[in-house]
Protein backbone atom coordinates (compact mmCIF):
# COMPACT_ATOMS: atom_id res chain seq x y z
CA UNK A 1 0.00 0.00 0.00
CA UNK A 2 0.97 3.64 -0.18
CA UNK A 3 2.17 4.01 3.43
CA UNK A 4 0.14 3.54 6.61
CA UNK A 5 -2.27 0.73 7.41
CA UNK A 6 -5.35 -0.01 5.34
CA UNK A 7 -8.61 1.26 6.75
CA UNK A 8 -10.78 -1.83 7.02
CA UNK A 9 -13.93 -0.39 8.59
CA UNK A 10 -16.87 0.46 6.39
CA UNK A 11 -16.43 4.01 5.07
CA UNK A 12 -19.23 6.50 5.40
CA UNK A 13 -19.49 6.71 1.65
CA UNK A 14 -21.94 3.89 0.97
CA UNK A 15 -22.62 2.39 -2.45
CA UNK A 16 -25.87 4.37 -2.55
CA UNK A 17 -24.01 7.64 -2.02
CA UNK A 18 -21.64 6.74 -4.82
CA UNK A 19 -24.49 5.94 -7.17
CA UNK A 20 -26.13 9.29 -6.38
CA UNK A 21 -22.81 11.10 -6.92
CA UNK A 22 -22.29 9.25 -10.20
CA UNK A 23 -25.82 10.08 -11.32
CA UNK A 24 -25.40 13.79 -10.56
CA UNK A 25 -22.10 14.16 -12.39
CA UNK A 26 -23.11 11.79 -15.17
CA UNK A 27 -26.27 13.77 -15.87
CA UNK A 28 -24.31 17.03 -15.69
CA UNK A 29 -21.80 15.71 -18.24
CA UNK A 30 -24.49 14.43 -20.60
CA UNK A 31 -26.44 17.69 -20.40
CA UNK A 32 -23.29 19.73 -21.01
CA UNK A 33 -22.47 17.64 -24.08
CA UNK A 34 -26.03 17.75 -25.36
CA UNK A 35 -26.39 21.51 -24.94
CA UNK A 36 -22.95 22.70 -26.06
CA UNK A 37 -22.14 20.33 -28.93
CA UNK A 38 -23.05 21.72 -32.38
CA UNK A 39 -24.84 18.60 -33.56
CA UNK A 40 -26.15 20.33 -36.71
CA UNK A 41 -23.03 20.88 -38.75
CA UNK A 42 -24.74 23.16 -41.24
CA UNK A 43 -28.26 24.65 -41.18
CA UNK A 44 -30.39 22.40 -43.34
CA UNK A 45 -27.80 19.63 -43.35
CA UNK A 46 -25.09 18.70 -45.83
CA UNK A 47 -25.71 18.43 -49.57
CA UNK A 48 -25.31 14.99 -51.20
CA UNK A 49 -21.83 13.55 -50.72
CA UNK A 50 -19.39 12.64 -53.45
CA UNK A 51 -17.84 9.45 -52.04
CA UNK A 52 -14.61 10.05 -53.97
CA UNK A 53 -14.48 13.72 -52.89
CA UNK A 54 -13.54 14.72 -56.44
CA UNK A 55 -10.13 13.05 -56.13
CA UNK A 56 -8.42 11.53 -59.15
CA UNK A 57 -8.38 7.72 -59.60
CA UNK A 58 -4.61 7.44 -59.18
CA UNK A 59 -4.71 9.13 -55.77
CA UNK A 60 -7.70 7.05 -54.69
CA UNK A 61 -5.87 3.88 -55.70
CA UNK A 62 -2.82 4.93 -53.69
CA UNK A 63 -4.98 5.64 -50.64
CA UNK A 64 -6.82 2.33 -51.00
CA UNK A 65 -3.55 0.43 -51.36
CA UNK A 66 -2.24 1.85 -48.10
CA UNK A 67 -5.46 1.72 -46.10
CA UNK A 68 -6.30 -1.83 -47.18
CA UNK A 69 -3.13 -2.95 -45.42
CA UNK A 70 -2.72 -0.47 -42.57
CA UNK A 71 -6.29 -0.52 -41.25
CA UNK A 72 -6.36 -4.29 -40.55
CA UNK A 73 -3.02 -3.98 -38.78
CA UNK A 74 -4.32 -1.10 -36.66
CA UNK A 75 -7.54 -2.93 -35.80
CA UNK A 76 -5.59 -6.06 -34.93
CA UNK A 77 -3.43 -4.00 -32.58
CA UNK A 78 -6.54 -2.66 -30.85
CA UNK A 79 -8.01 -6.16 -30.59
CA UNK A 80 -4.81 -7.63 -29.13
CA UNK A 81 -4.54 -4.75 -26.67
CA UNK A 82 -8.14 -5.25 -25.52
CA UNK A 83 -7.62 -9.00 -25.19
CA UNK A 84 -4.46 -8.60 -23.11
CA UNK A 85 -6.10 -5.96 -20.92
CA UNK A 86 -9.07 -8.26 -20.30
CA UNK A 87 -6.92 -11.32 -19.58
CA UNK A 88 -4.70 -9.46 -17.13
CA UNK A 89 -7.50 -7.57 -15.40
CA UNK A 90 -10.45 -9.94 -15.54
CA UNK A 91 -8.72 -13.23 -14.77
CA UNK A 92 -6.48 -14.17 -11.80
CA UNK A 93 -3.39 -14.05 -14.05
CA UNK A 94 -2.76 -10.33 -13.57
CA UNK A 95 -3.13 -10.46 -9.79
CA UNK A 96 -0.79 -13.47 -9.61
CA UNK A 97 1.86 -11.69 -11.67
CA UNK A 98 1.65 -8.58 -9.51
CA UNK A 99 1.81 -10.54 -6.25
CA UNK A 100 5.05 -12.13 -7.47
CA UNK A 101 6.77 -8.76 -7.80
CA UNK A 102 9.45 -7.74 -5.28
CA UNK A 103 9.01 -4.83 -2.89
CA UNK A 104 6.10 -6.06 -0.77
CA UNK A 105 7.54 -4.13 2.20
CA UNK A 106 7.38 -0.93 0.16
CA UNK A 107 3.94 -0.95 -1.38
CA UNK A 108 4.38 2.33 -3.23
CA UNK A 109 7.37 0.87 -5.08
CA UNK A 110 5.54 -2.38 -5.72
CA UNK A 111 2.53 -0.49 -7.07
CA UNK A 112 4.74 1.39 -9.53
CA UNK A 113 6.36 -1.89 -10.57
CA UNK A 114 2.90 -3.37 -11.10
CA UNK A 115 1.92 -0.50 -13.38
CA UNK A 116 5.19 -0.80 -15.27
CA UNK A 117 4.70 -4.56 -15.70
CA UNK A 118 1.10 -4.39 -16.91
CA UNK A 119 1.79 -1.58 -19.36
CA UNK A 120 5.00 -3.27 -20.55
CA UNK A 121 3.08 -6.44 -21.37
CA UNK A 122 0.67 -4.36 -23.44
CA UNK A 123 3.54 -2.73 -25.32
CA UNK A 124 5.39 -5.99 -25.94
CA UNK A 125 2.43 -8.00 -27.25
CA UNK A 126 1.41 -5.24 -29.68
CA UNK A 127 4.97 -4.37 -30.70
CA UNK A 128 5.08 -6.65 -33.78
CA UNK A 129 1.89 -5.06 -35.10
CA UNK A 130 3.19 -1.57 -34.36
CA UNK A 131 6.42 -2.36 -36.20
CA UNK A 132 4.36 -3.68 -39.11
CA UNK A 133 2.27 -0.50 -39.13
CA UNK A 134 5.39 1.66 -39.08
CA UNK A 135 6.85 -0.34 -41.95
CA UNK A 136 3.67 0.22 -43.99
CA UNK A 137 3.81 3.95 -43.23
CA UNK A 138 7.41 4.06 -44.42
CA UNK A 139 6.62 2.16 -47.60
CA UNK A 140 3.79 4.63 -48.30
CA UNK A 141 6.06 7.62 -47.69
CA UNK A 142 4.17 8.75 -44.58
CA UNK A 143 6.89 8.10 -42.01
CA UNK A 144 10.35 9.64 -42.15
CA UNK A 145 11.58 8.36 -38.78
CA UNK A 146 14.63 6.22 -38.24
CA UNK A 147 14.01 3.06 -36.26
CA UNK A 148 16.00 4.55 -33.40
CA UNK A 149 13.81 7.65 -33.35
CA UNK A 150 10.68 5.50 -33.56
CA UNK A 151 11.88 3.37 -30.63
CA UNK A 152 12.55 6.51 -28.58
CA UNK A 153 8.97 7.66 -29.21
CA UNK A 154 7.62 4.26 -28.13
CA UNK A 155 9.70 4.32 -24.95
CA UNK A 156 8.74 7.94 -24.26
CA UNK A 157 5.05 7.13 -24.53
CA UNK A 158 5.53 4.10 -22.30
CA UNK A 159 7.43 6.16 -19.73
CA UNK A 160 4.73 8.83 -19.69
CA UNK A 161 2.06 6.17 -19.30
CA UNK A 162 3.85 4.54 -16.38
CA UNK A 163 4.52 7.87 -14.68
CA UNK A 164 1.00 9.28 -14.99
CA UNK A 165 -0.71 5.99 -14.16
CA UNK A 166 1.52 5.32 -11.16
CA UNK A 167 0.94 8.80 -9.74
CA UNK A 168 -2.81 8.39 -10.22
CA UNK A 169 -2.99 4.98 -8.55
CA UNK A 170 -0.68 6.03 -5.72
CA UNK A 171 -3.01 8.94 -5.04
CA UNK A 172 -6.07 6.67 -5.13
CA UNK A 173 -4.45 4.19 -2.76
CA UNK A 174 -3.37 6.94 -0.39
CA UNK A 175 -6.86 8.43 -0.27
CA UNK A 176 -8.50 5.02 0.15
CA UNK A 177 -6.18 4.22 3.05
CA UNK A 178 -6.66 7.49 4.93
CA UNK A 179 -9.90 9.25 4.01
CA UNK A 180 -13.39 8.08 4.95
CA UNK A 181 -15.14 9.31 1.83
CA UNK A 182 -12.07 8.59 -0.25
CA UNK A 183 -14.08 8.02 -3.43
CA UNK A 184 -15.55 11.53 -3.19
CA UNK A 185 -12.16 13.20 -2.80
CA UNK A 186 -10.64 10.94 -5.48
CA UNK A 187 -13.32 11.80 -8.01
CA UNK A 188 -12.84 15.53 -7.47
CA UNK A 189 -9.08 15.04 -7.75
CA UNK A 190 -9.62 13.29 -11.09
CA UNK A 191 -11.52 16.30 -12.36
CA UNK A 192 -8.77 18.63 -11.16
CA UNK A 193 -6.16 16.44 -12.87
CA UNK A 194 -7.91 16.92 -16.21
CA UNK A 195 -7.72 20.69 -15.76
CA UNK A 196 -4.03 20.60 -14.82
CA UNK A 197 -3.17 18.23 -17.67
CA UNK A 198 -4.86 20.48 -20.21
CA UNK A 199 -2.84 23.47 -19.02
CA UNK A 200 0.42 21.54 -18.76
CA UNK A 201 0.23 19.66 -22.07
CA UNK A 202 1.62 22.44 -24.31
CA UNK A 203 4.64 23.07 -22.09
CA UNK A 204 5.33 19.54 -20.78
CA UNK A 205 4.21 16.97 -23.36
CA UNK A 206 4.48 18.72 -26.73
CA UNK A 207 8.25 19.37 -26.44
CA UNK A 208 8.84 15.64 -25.95
CA UNK A 209 7.75 14.90 -29.50
CA UNK A 210 8.84 17.96 -31.46
CA UNK A 211 11.19 20.92 -31.47
CA UNK A 212 9.80 24.38 -32.08
CA UNK A 213 11.39 27.41 -33.67
CA UNK A 214 9.86 30.83 -34.34
CA UNK A 215 8.67 31.27 -37.91
CA UNK A 216 10.93 33.62 -39.81
CA UNK A 217 9.58 37.11 -40.39
CA UNK A 218 7.96 37.33 -43.78
CA UNK A 219 4.66 37.49 -45.67
CA UNK A 220 3.35 34.15 -44.34
CA UNK A 221 3.97 34.97 -40.69
CA UNK A 222 2.45 38.41 -41.14
CA UNK A 223 -0.54 36.89 -42.92
CA UNK A 224 -1.20 34.39 -40.11
CA UNK A 225 -0.94 37.04 -37.40
CA UNK A 226 -3.31 39.28 -39.36
CA UNK A 227 -5.71 36.36 -39.77
CA UNK A 228 -5.75 35.86 -36.00
CA UNK A 229 -6.21 39.59 -35.43
CA UNK A 230 -9.14 39.65 -37.88
CA UNK A 231 -10.63 36.84 -35.81
CA UNK A 232 -10.19 38.83 -32.60
CA UNK A 233 -7.71 36.32 -31.19
CA UNK A 234 -4.52 37.39 -29.45
CA UNK A 235 -1.54 35.30 -30.56
CA UNK A 236 1.87 35.60 -28.94
CA UNK A 237 3.96 33.78 -31.55
CA UNK A 238 3.95 31.66 -34.70
CA UNK A 239 6.08 28.54 -34.30
CA UNK A 240 7.25 25.87 -36.71
CA UNK A 241 7.39 22.26 -35.47
CA UNK A 242 9.96 19.92 -36.98
CA UNK A 243 7.33 17.32 -37.88
CA UNK A 244 9.33 16.29 -40.95
CA UNK A 245 11.64 14.38 -38.59
CA UNK A 246 8.77 11.93 -38.14
CA UNK A 247 6.21 12.27 -40.91
CA UNK A 248 5.25 13.79 -44.23
CA UNK A 249 1.73 14.52 -42.94
CA UNK A 250 0.68 18.18 -42.79
CA UNK A 251 -1.06 19.91 -39.92
CA UNK A 252 -1.23 23.00 -37.72
CA UNK A 253 -2.80 23.85 -34.39
CA UNK A 254 -3.24 26.66 -31.88
CA UNK A 255 -1.71 25.93 -28.48
CA UNK A 256 -1.78 27.59 -25.08
CA UNK A 257 -4.13 30.03 -23.39
CA UNK A 258 -4.42 33.81 -23.23
CA UNK A 259 -1.15 35.72 -23.67
CA UNK A 260 0.83 32.48 -24.17
CA UNK A 261 -1.29 31.35 -27.11
CA UNK A 262 0.72 30.47 -30.21
CA UNK A 263 0.06 29.18 -33.69
CA UNK A 264 2.06 26.03 -34.42
CA UNK A 265 2.62 25.00 -38.04
CA UNK A 266 4.20 21.73 -39.16
CA UNK A 267 7.25 22.36 -41.31
CA UNK A 268 5.73 19.92 -43.80
CA UNK A 269 2.79 22.30 -44.20
CA UNK A 270 5.15 25.00 -45.43
CA UNK A 271 5.60 22.95 -48.60
CA UNK A 272 1.99 23.78 -49.55
CA UNK A 273 0.69 27.13 -50.74
CA UNK A 274 0.25 30.11 -48.38
CA UNK A 275 -3.48 29.95 -49.16
CA UNK A 276 -3.71 26.39 -47.83
CA UNK A 277 -1.68 27.27 -44.75
CA UNK A 278 -4.10 30.12 -44.02
CA UNK A 279 -7.11 27.84 -44.44
CA UNK A 280 -5.75 25.22 -42.06
CA UNK A 281 -4.80 27.86 -39.49
CA UNK A 282 -8.25 29.47 -39.89
CA UNK A 283 -9.77 26.11 -38.93
CA UNK A 284 -7.56 25.94 -35.85
CA UNK A 285 -8.47 29.51 -34.91
CA UNK A 286 -12.07 28.32 -35.00
CA UNK A 287 -11.34 26.06 -32.04
CA UNK A 288 -9.95 29.02 -30.14
CA UNK A 289 -12.79 31.36 -31.10
CA UNK A 290 -15.32 28.82 -29.84
CA UNK A 291 -13.29 28.02 -26.70
CA UNK A 292 -13.29 24.36 -27.72
CA UNK A 293 -10.26 23.43 -25.63
CA UNK A 294 -11.55 25.20 -22.52
CA UNK A 295 -15.07 23.87 -22.97
CA UNK A 296 -13.79 20.38 -23.67
CA UNK A 297 -11.55 20.54 -20.63
CA UNK A 298 -14.40 21.57 -18.34
CA UNK A 299 -16.72 18.88 -19.67
CA UNK A 300 -13.85 16.40 -19.53
CA UNK A 301 -13.28 17.28 -15.89
CA UNK A 302 -16.96 16.65 -15.11
CA UNK A 303 -16.75 13.38 -17.01
CA UNK A 304 -13.64 12.42 -15.03
CA UNK A 305 -15.50 12.93 -11.75
CA UNK A 306 -18.28 10.65 -12.99
CA UNK A 307 -15.83 8.19 -14.51
CA UNK A 308 -13.72 7.83 -11.39
CA UNK A 309 -16.86 7.29 -9.33
CA UNK A 310 -17.98 4.61 -11.76
CA UNK A 311 -14.55 3.01 -11.54
CA UNK A 312 -14.83 2.74 -7.74
CA UNK A 313 -18.23 1.08 -8.10
CA UNK A 314 -16.95 -1.43 -10.64
CA UNK A 315 -13.81 -2.04 -8.61
CA UNK A 316 -16.04 -3.08 -5.70
CA UNK A 317 -18.09 -5.47 -7.82
CA UNK A 318 -18.05 -8.97 -6.33
CA UNK A 319 -18.20 -10.48 -9.81
CA UNK A 320 -15.21 -8.54 -11.15
CA UNK A 321 -13.17 -9.05 -7.98
CA UNK A 322 -13.86 -12.77 -8.07
CA UNK A 323 -12.98 -13.05 -11.76
CA UNK A 324 -9.76 -11.07 -11.24
CA UNK A 325 -8.68 -13.18 -8.28
CA UNK A 326 -8.60 -10.08 -6.11
CA UNK A 327 -11.01 -11.27 -3.43
CA UNK A 328 -8.73 -14.18 -2.54
CA UNK A 329 -11.35 -16.84 -3.22
CA UNK A 330 -10.13 -20.35 -3.77
CA UNK A 331 -11.89 -22.67 -6.25
CA UNK A 332 -14.03 -24.07 -3.42
CA UNK A 333 -15.26 -20.57 -2.58
CA UNK A 334 -13.39 -20.04 0.69
CA UNK A 335 -12.65 -16.36 1.17
CA UNK A 336 -9.20 -15.65 2.60
CA UNK A 337 -9.10 -11.90 2.04
CA UNK A 338 -12.42 -10.24 2.84
CA UNK A 339 -12.79 -6.50 3.41
CA UNK A 340 -15.88 -4.59 4.58
CA UNK A 341 -15.40 -2.13 1.70
CA UNK A 342 -14.39 -4.11 -1.42
CA UNK A 343 -13.85 -1.00 -3.55
CA UNK A 344 -11.50 0.46 -0.95
CA UNK A 345 -9.56 -2.80 -0.89
CA UNK A 346 -9.34 -2.83 -4.70
CA UNK A 347 -7.66 0.56 -4.54
CA UNK A 348 -5.28 -0.29 -1.70
CA UNK A 349 -4.27 -3.80 -2.77
CA UNK A 350 -1.37 -3.77 -5.21
CA UNK A 351 -2.91 -6.84 -6.82
CA UNK A 352 -5.84 -4.62 -7.83
CA UNK A 353 -3.74 -2.70 -10.37
CA UNK A 354 -4.56 -4.99 -13.35
CA UNK A 355 -8.28 -4.82 -12.57
CA UNK A 356 -8.27 -1.02 -12.31
CA UNK A 357 -6.38 -0.65 -15.59
CA UNK A 358 -8.75 -3.09 -17.29
CA UNK A 359 -11.81 -1.17 -16.12
CA UNK A 360 -10.32 2.09 -17.34
CA UNK A 361 -9.13 0.73 -20.69
CA UNK A 362 -12.30 -1.15 -21.59
CA UNK A 363 -14.54 1.72 -20.46
CA UNK A 364 -12.55 4.13 -22.64
CA UNK A 365 -13.05 1.88 -25.66
CA UNK A 366 -16.79 1.54 -25.03
CA UNK A 367 -17.30 5.31 -24.73
CA UNK A 368 -15.15 6.11 -27.77
CA UNK A 369 -18.10 6.47 -30.22
CA UNK A 370 -19.65 9.17 -28.02
CA UNK A 371 -16.35 11.01 -27.57
CA UNK A 372 -15.64 10.93 -31.30
CA UNK A 373 -19.17 11.99 -32.25
CA UNK A 374 -18.64 15.13 -30.18
CA UNK A 375 -15.18 15.59 -31.70
CA UNK A 376 -16.52 15.40 -35.26
CA UNK A 377 -19.21 17.97 -34.52
CA UNK A 378 -16.68 20.35 -32.99
CA UNK A 379 -14.32 19.90 -35.95
CA UNK A 380 -17.17 20.62 -38.37
CA UNK A 381 -17.92 23.86 -36.49
CA UNK A 382 -14.26 24.84 -36.84
CA UNK A 383 -14.53 24.15 -40.58
CA UNK A 384 -17.51 26.50 -40.82
CA UNK A 385 -15.53 29.10 -38.88
CA UNK A 386 -12.66 28.79 -41.36
CA UNK A 387 -15.09 29.30 -44.23
CA UNK A 388 -16.63 32.34 -42.54
CA UNK A 389 -13.19 33.81 -41.83
CA UNK A 390 -11.63 33.23 -45.25
CA UNK A 391 -14.71 33.17 -47.52
CA UNK A 392 -12.80 30.71 -49.70
CA UNK A 393 -14.86 27.51 -50.14
CA UNK A 394 -13.09 26.54 -53.36
CA UNK A 395 -9.69 26.79 -51.71
CA UNK A 396 -11.06 24.96 -48.66
CA UNK A 397 -12.19 22.02 -50.79
CA UNK A 398 -8.83 21.92 -52.58
CA UNK A 399 -7.06 21.99 -49.24
CA UNK A 400 -9.13 19.04 -47.97
CA UNK A 401 -8.21 17.03 -51.06
CA UNK A 402 -4.56 17.93 -50.51
CA UNK A 403 -4.78 16.79 -46.89
CA UNK A 404 -6.37 13.48 -47.87
CA UNK A 405 -3.80 12.91 -50.60
CA UNK A 406 -0.81 13.79 -48.42
CA UNK A 407 -2.00 11.98 -45.29
CA UNK A 408 -3.50 9.07 -47.29
CA UNK A 409 -6.91 9.47 -45.67
CA UNK A 410 -9.84 7.49 -47.04
CA UNK A 411 -12.30 10.16 -48.30
CA UNK A 412 -15.27 7.92 -47.36
CA UNK A 413 -14.29 5.23 -44.84
CA UNK A 414 -16.81 2.54 -43.81
CA UNK A 415 -19.51 3.98 -41.61
CA UNK A 416 -18.80 1.68 -38.67
CA UNK A 417 -15.13 2.65 -38.65
CA UNK A 418 -15.93 6.34 -38.85
CA UNK A 419 -18.48 5.96 -36.05
CA UNK A 420 -16.00 4.32 -33.69
CA UNK A 421 -12.64 5.80 -34.61
CA UNK A 422 -13.27 8.93 -36.69
CA UNK A 423 -12.27 12.07 -34.81
CA UNK A 424 -12.90 14.39 -37.79
CA UNK A 425 -15.54 14.55 -40.52
CA UNK A 426 -14.54 12.58 -43.59
CA UNK A 427 -12.99 14.36 -46.56
CA UNK A 428 -16.22 13.87 -48.51
CA UNK A 429 -18.22 15.43 -45.67
CA UNK A 430 -15.88 18.40 -45.34
CA UNK A 431 -16.04 19.16 -49.05
CA UNK A 432 -19.83 18.84 -48.94
CA UNK A 433 -19.77 21.26 -46.01
CA UNK A 434 -17.92 23.81 -48.13
CA UNK A 435 -20.40 23.33 -50.97
CA UNK A 436 -23.33 23.75 -48.59
CA UNK A 437 -21.76 26.86 -47.08
CA UNK A 438 -21.33 28.38 -50.54
CA UNK A 439 -24.91 27.56 -51.50
CA UNK A 440 -26.17 29.31 -48.37
CA UNK A 441 -24.38 32.58 -49.14
Where are these regions (language model features)?
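N-terminal signal-anchor/signal peptide hydrophobic helix marking the start
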Residues: 346-357
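Polar-ligand-bearing catalytic/cofactor-coordination segments
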Residues: 2-22, 33-91, 96-345, 361, ...
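Final/C-terminal transmembrane alpha-helix of multipass membrane proteins
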Residues: 26-30
Amino acid sequence: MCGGSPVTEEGRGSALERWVWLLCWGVATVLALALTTPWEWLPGGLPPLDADAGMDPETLERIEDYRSRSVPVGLASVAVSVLVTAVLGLTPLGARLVRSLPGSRYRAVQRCLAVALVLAIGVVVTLPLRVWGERLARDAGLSTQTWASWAVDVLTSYGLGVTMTSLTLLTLAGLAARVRRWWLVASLAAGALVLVASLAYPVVIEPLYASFTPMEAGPLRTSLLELAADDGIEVDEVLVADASQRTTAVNAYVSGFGPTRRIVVYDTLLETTPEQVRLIVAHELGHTANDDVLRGTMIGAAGAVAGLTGLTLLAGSAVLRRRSGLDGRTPDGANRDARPDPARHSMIAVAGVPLLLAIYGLSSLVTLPVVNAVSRAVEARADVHALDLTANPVGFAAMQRRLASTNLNDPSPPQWRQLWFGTHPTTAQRIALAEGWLAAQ
